[in-house]
Amino acid sequence: DNVWLRFVALVHDIAKPRTKAFKEGLGWTFHGHEELGARMMKSLFRRLRLPLDPLPYVEKLVRLHLRPMALVNEIVTDSAVRRLVFDAGNDVDDLMKLCRADITSKNPGLVKKYIRNYDLVLQKIVEVEGRDRLRNWQPPVKGEEIMAICGLQQGKMVGVLKKAIEEAILDGRIPN
């Protein structure tokens, strides 16, 4: 029922032709098509005269559409899942629907493997999100508080400290 999720399903691989390259031993690759595709959305929206309100949502899902399945190429760590949920925010459910719909192959064994991987990532998201409550996450410390606690003036260092706190939470080094 989400027309923009359906739109993303149609356009998420739009940059594959521009990024197609043959790598010896690997075959055809499309490295970076997700980032280039996200950057192409603004001009596509303008050419098609689409409303710009859903553009950030569409760009985000195009940019992130490979991330959930890429998690299973390594051990699915809590910090990787935290970063995914943090980056996707409220759109993580739509992102996972897109990933599930993108599992296509004529090879039944490959489809089974991808679905198993998808289920693993989905389960891990539920576990981590249940523990950490990351959706709509807000940093626990505001810039003004950092300035007051550290005796700093407004500036770059405040942002550096705020980002370091955010990274420590996402890595699980300090609790949320």
Question: Where do the protein language model's features map onto the residues?
Answer:
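Conserved, hydrophobic alpha-helical core segments of structured domains
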Residues: 1-99, 109
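Charged substrate- and nucleic-acid-binding regions of tRNA-handling and nucleotidyl-transfer enzymes
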Residues: 42-47, 105-176
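Family-specific functional microsites
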Residues: 102
